[in-house]
Amino acid sequence: MQGRCAVTVGMLGGVLILAARMVYNTRMKLNTIICAAAVCGCVSFATAADEPAKTETPEPSKAELAEEEKGEEEEDSLVSAEAYFGVDSKYITYGVMDGKDPIVRMNGYVTFLDWWYIGAEVLFDVTKGNGKRGPYGWGNRAGKYTTVDAQTGLAHEWKLGETLGTLSIDVYYTYEYVARHKGTMNDTQYLDFEIKLKDLWFEPRLWFERDLMADDGTYVNLEVGHTFPLIGDGEDATLTFKPSFAQGWGNTLRTRGYGLSDDHGGLMDATIKGELVWAVCDHVKVKAYIAYCDYWFDRKLRDGARAYNGAWGGSNDHSWNFYGGVGVALSF
């Protein structure tokens, strides 16, 4: 009996010792696992802290990069130049004919610091009977200049955001040297102001002209239009089309100076125009346009325009004109 009790006590003691060891080993394993997890967590946290937060600084889009590059180019551009060579089917001024046959138009301008510019425009007659008619009679000037306009002015553009588009302002002075043939033909000086909003669906343009020398007349023209991209998109469009409508107004001095009315000013030429522009490359554009103009809103001035055009003879006895042109524009 005592022997069995001793064996039983011995077995119980062994079981307790084994259980204690298992508990001890389990605690050690748990401690090891916890320590390892803590070390891994610290390492992961340190690694994450060293890496840049990509979601906080996204990469700029291509459009943003292009806009930044364009802005840098504009800032770095101290001097720029542009030139134009084209042919117009008629010599039209204020909606009436100063030449019934085609003329060649050439101009060139140099701009400094994207503000001040200087340049000139020359018109050439290409036919024998296209000399500007009137009391001075310019005569046969085929292949010779008709006018030479020397210009200087200040022009700049400001981007006002998507709502207001781009504001463009141009103030310039023109000295117009005219051809001499019979008698003395006085030169003319002009002071002009243009303001327009671009990059909008509805693009308005206001042009104010003051004749400083010939008759001191004032002419104002308001134009509205929209540029549709036909090939490409936005400013990078390869081919665009712009339809527009413009209405001119002149005071009595302006209409008298052009022989339209001696004692009456008012609404003058109304013009509907369509213009195509093909951007051949970054520095070359081909431009073509067609236009129709008439004196719609003032009967007295319409009669004056009919008489002005009719002085060319033939079938020109009307107040309206249909004309067009094509040319190449270069920019550097």
Give residue spans per PLM region:
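Cleavable N-terminal export/targeting peptides
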Residues: 1-80
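Outer-membrane pore/translocation modules
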Residues: 97-98, 120-223, 303, 308-322
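Detector for outer-membrane/organellar transmembrane beta-barrel domains
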Residues: 187-271, 275
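Structural signature of outer-membrane beta-barrel domains
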Residues: 88-92, 125-129, 176-180, 209-213, ...
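Short glycine/proline- and aromatic-enriched beta-strand/turn motifs that initiate or cap beta-hairpins
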Residues: 49-132, 323, 329
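Short loop/turn motifs that connect adjacent beta-strands in outer-membrane beta-barrel proteins
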Residues: 69-80, 115-118, 142, 157-168, ...
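Predominantly the C-terminal beta-signal and adjacent terminal strand-loop region
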Residues: 272, 277-332
